[in-house]
């Protein structure tokens, strides 16, 4: 992470809070999802429960859900092993939201198939691309 020195420095400030966003998935000018990407050497139910709990109750998850809500898109946790061979996804809408295990090709198809919500397209009057 090329920004690690900046992040380390910024996190030391005693001014409110800061959180980076791992990924915002877009289709053209419209956001379709906020993704929190996280890894673990192994993936089992205990790991899933721990990650889901952390992202529901702690600062980072609360703020990421806030960003997703402001954009009018869903918030997903994407948990994978270090080799990106095992992938599981949680559409986190409650502390008990479930996980869906996906092979790489299924994950790619799922992520590629996300489309803007009607409410996002209807309320978006800000152009997100340069007209140059």
What are the language-model segments listed below?
Residues 16-19, 30, 55-66:
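Short, well-structured alpha-helical interface segments that form or flank functional binding sites
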Residues 81-131:
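Domain-level recognition of nuclease-like catalytic cores that cleave nucleotide substrates
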Residues 62-90:
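Nucleic-acid nuclease catalytic cores
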Residues 1-29:
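Active-site metal-binding core of divalent-cation-utilizing nuclease and nuclease-like domains
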Residues 24, 42, 46, 124-127, ...:
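Intrinsic disorder/low-complexity detector
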Residues 41-63:
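Mg2+/Mn2+-dependent nuclease catalytic core
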Residues 35-38, 57, 78-80:
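Short His-Asn-centered micro-motif
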